[in-house]
């Protein structure tokens, strides 16, 4: 259920999140000049655009067209309370039992998750989280239509013909990227940060 780990092994959505929809856009914010991003952009410039969230103009965003795998649970299959109960279960059955016995401060990791909340669910969700407040540590709440309210949302459900046409265009023009051909011509390592974050601690805020 760990977010990055689940993606690495091929799970379509991170952690304990259901698929956003049967068809959706997934967006990733990236830094301009990053070698991996620039290599990707050479092959798929049509998937890249300026980020509207970076005031310095140094970030871009990549939009990936995604179709959920057959039989996937999507966000509309779960109520907000059902999703919250999954988070609670993982916290109790996975995070807490996996805490190292050497931890003397009673500090644990947590299950981070974004819960999609319909208009009629808000009061119940607030009461539920307060009742179980010692269980939740990193839960975000998003309005059901939040993916349409916020520009370049990380996940956006495809709901219109124009959006589906964009999905098809992104997919049809996608070019496979062979990352084995990527190599750095300049070392961009920030040595101060590398030293500061060595030996199991990090001084960089």
Annotate the PLM regions.
Residues 1, 8-193:
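Catalytic alpha/beta core of large soluble enzyme barrels
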Residues 188-205:
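Short acidic, low-complexity intrinsically disordered linear motifs used
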